[in-house]
Structures are given as structure tokens and as C-alpha cells.
């Protein structure tokens, strides 16, 4: 567990008492029982359990948020649960596995990088704002990566469609579906924070969470656009595959058109009639081969 004094430029302190000073407390899941006197048993239990649904609950003097941090590992999307308790004088973040986003935020705050709001207000709700803002940016970057991968596959499909392209496309669509399931609930978290039923955010800071809500809407719009683009890529694959099949059928049609008359002639000459042209001619075979070859050449030129 790490306790930061927000007012003293995030100085690490050993102890903290409620309302003593604004604090940011980072905890691992096995330490969350230390806060059982401050928060409800249900919330504490959800911090320990895995695979809980994303949610937000407003209590008398704090708000509990369960949200997923999305990451890409070898192109596969995984989620890491982050539990947040927000009060007027504290913010507690509980994580089950290391989340680099939090520590990157701490470093940026100490270096006064991309965190200028702290010059105006060093409150826990501003920390929550920056956490959510970075989650949204992180999610948008993942969507952008999937879009780039989809565009790359589309270009390869237009050059030469292969079955591997379909497998890659299906993988991206599966990851996009997983991403949609993880991102959609964030919209309801944003709406609840804007309402601020228990007033832990404060009227002055609501404007920042309205901005978060706007970013969430844009994020979901980007996600919808990604789904549409992947559908277009799938259509492009099917179209190119159909064109390739049509070209192949065209070749078979030409072959059939060329050899069908030849087969008819050879079938006639294979009949057991005594009186048959070229049958008694010494050069009949060669003449017939020449005629058949000439016909094949003429028919090929006509169809090509």
C-alpha cells in the first residue's frame, strides 16, 4: 500500500486518517481488508473477487467504481480490473495486477506533465478525472490499432485475397467485439458521475466529468465506426474472392468451348463406319490433327 499526500505534491506518507488531508491510496487486492471499516462489505468483496461486471455505486460519503483497464498482449485484448473509492478527501485505487497507467499518471503529476488542472484544484476528484481520461485515451489507441490492422488486411485482400486474410479479419472482429463489451458500460459510469448524487465530486468539478462523458461518446462512435469498417473489409474480401472465382470459371468456360467441338469431331471419327473421310488416306491422321489444332486455335482466339 502506498499513500500519497495530494496537497504536498504527492509526497509518500506512512499513515493517513480520514479527512486529515486529501490522499490517494494505492492498494493491492490482498490489502483491501484494511479498509473494511470505511467501506461496505459488498464493495470490499468485489475488490477481491474476479470477473465482476463494471459498475458504479453511490454511497453516503463515497462513490465506488469498478472499471476495466484494457491492454493488448500479442495483439489479444485483455482486461485488468481497477476498483476505485472516491470521497471528498480521498481516492483509493485497488488493483489485482500491475497497472502501468496509474504509475505513469503519478510520474506525470510529479513532473507537471499533462496534469495542469492540479494547479487549480488538488482534489481527489481531479485524480479520478485523469484516470478516466487516460483509460479513454488508452482505449482509443487500441481501437486505432485495430483500424490500422484492418486497413492493412484490406490492402492485402485487394492485391491477392487468401484464406489467411479471412482468418486475420475474423480475429480482429472477435477482438473488436470483446472491446465493445468492455467499453459500453463506461457510458453509464460517466452519466452517474455527472449526476454526482452524493456530491463527492463537487459542483465546480462537474464540468470536467461532462468532458469525460463527451469523450466516452466519441470513443463509442469510434468503436461503431471500427465495426462498420471491418464489415466493409469482409465485403471486400468476399467481392475479391467472387471475382477470382469468376475469372477461374471464365477459364473453364473457354476450355469447354474450345474442346467441345473437338470432342464432337473425334467422337464422329471414332464410329465404326466403312465410308469415313480420311480413313483410307495415308496422311489422314495428320490432316485431321492439323484441322483439330487449327480449330482449337481459332476458337481460342474468338473467346479470348
Task: Explain the meaning of each model-derived region.
Residues 1-195, 202, 211, 215-218:
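Peripheral, non-transmembrane regulatory/ligand-interaction domains of membrane transport proteins
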Residues 52, 163, 186, 193, ...:
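Flexible domain-boundary/linker segments
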Residues 120-121, 193-209, 227-242:
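Hydrophobic alpha-helical transmembrane segments
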Residues 217-304:
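Hydrophobic alpha-helical transmembrane segments and their immediately adjacent juxtamembrane loops
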Amino acid at each position: 500500500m502506498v499513500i500519497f499526500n495530494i496537497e504536498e505534491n504527492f509526497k509518500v506518507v506512512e499513515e493517513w486518517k480520514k479527512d486529515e488531508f486529501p490522499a490517494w491510496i494505492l492498494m493491492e487486492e490482498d490489502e483491501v481488508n484494511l479498509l473494511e471499516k470505511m467501506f461496505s462489505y459488498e464493495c470490499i468483496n468485489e475488490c477481491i473477487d474476479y470477473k465482476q461486471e463494471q459498475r458504479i455505486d453511490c454511497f453516503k460519503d463515497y462513490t465506488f467504481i469498478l472499471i476495466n483497464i484494457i491492454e493488448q498482449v500479442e495483439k489479444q485484448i485483455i482486461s485488468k480490473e481497477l476498483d476505485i473509492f472516491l470521497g471528498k478527501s480521498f481516492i483509493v485505487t485497488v488493483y489485482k495486477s500491475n497497472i502501468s497507467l496509474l504509475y505513469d499518471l503519478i510520474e506525470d503529476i510529479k513532473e507537471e506533465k499533462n496534469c495542469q488542472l492540479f494547479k487549480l484544484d488538488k482534489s481527489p476528484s481531479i485524480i479520478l478525472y485523469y484516470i478516466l481520461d487516460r483509460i479513454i485515451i488508452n482505449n482509443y489507441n487500441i481501437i486505432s490499432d485495430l483500424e490500422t490492422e484492418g486497413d492493412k488486411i484490406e490492402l492485402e485482400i485487394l492485391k491477392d485475397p487468401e484464406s489467411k486474410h479471412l482468418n486475420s479479419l475474423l480475429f480482429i472482429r472477435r477482438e473488436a467485439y470483446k472491446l465493445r463489451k468492455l467499453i459500453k458500460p463506461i457510458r453509464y459510469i460517466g452519466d452517474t458521475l455527472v449526476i454526482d448524487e452524493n456530491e463527492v465530486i463537487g459542483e465546480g468539478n462537474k464540468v470536467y466529468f461532462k468532458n469525460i462523458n463527451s469523450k466516452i461518446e466519441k470513443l463509442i462512435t469510434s468503436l461503431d465506426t471500427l465495426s462498420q469498417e471491418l464489415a466493409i473489409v469482409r465485403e471486400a474480401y468476399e467481392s475479391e474472392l467472387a471475382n477470382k472465382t469468376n475469372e477461374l470459371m471464365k477459364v473453364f468456360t473457354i476450355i469447354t468451348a474450345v474442346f467441345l467441338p473437338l470432342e464432337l469431331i473425334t467422337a464422329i471419327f471414332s464410329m465404326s463406319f466403312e465410308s469415313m473421310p480420311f480413313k483410307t488416306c495415308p496422311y489422314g491422321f495428320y490432316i485431321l490433327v492439323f484441322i483439330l489444332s487449327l480449330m482449337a486455335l481459332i476458337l481460342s482466339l474468338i473467346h479470348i
